[in-house]
A protein has these predicted regions:
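Carboxylate-rich, polar loop motifs that coordinate divalent cations or form catalytic acidic clusters
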Residues: 1-134
Length: 134
């Protein structure tokens, strides 16, 4: 009887601990959920709470429910310069996007991209990727 009381006491202490155990929850998103590509090169969260993902096929903005995809459009000079996004960095209220063909700055207000270029002492404009190569 004494052993039974001891066992019951131990069970009463141990069993509630399982109730408070935290289990990690992960959600895997892929192209079927709206991601532009299943290979993600870079992830950042901006000052508004959006998650930005750089992929092999464009830049994705995730609002917690849906993805918005930004891709290069050769007919639009204000689109992202290239679909192969290497790096995405959020600095304050600016979003910097590094691609295979240059660095873009995203305008939240205008919902478009500006290509960042260096102006050389000669007055010539040069993409940052060209400056690095030289």
């Amino acid at each position: 009887m004494k052993n039974l009381k001891r066992i019951i006491f131990i069970l009463l202490i141990i069993l509630p601990l399982r109730v408070f155990a935290d289990y990690e929850h992960f959600k895997l998103w892929d192209m079927s959920d709206g991601l532009s590509n299943n290979t993600v090169k870079s992830i950042t969260q901006d000052h508004l709470g959006f998650i930005w993902l750089g992929t092999f096929d464009g830049l994705c903005k995730f609002d917690g429910v849906d993805f918005t995809i930004f891709r290069h459009d050769s007919q639009d000079s204000l689109s992202i310069i290239n679909n192969y996004v290497e790096v995405v960095a959020s600095l304050g209220d600016e979003l910097w996007v590094g691609t295979e063909r240059g660095l873009n700055l995203y305008s939240y207000k205008e919902n478009n991209f500006r290509l960042c270029e260096w102006i050389l002492p000669t007055g010539e404009r040069q993409k940052i990727t060209e400056s690095i190569k030289n």
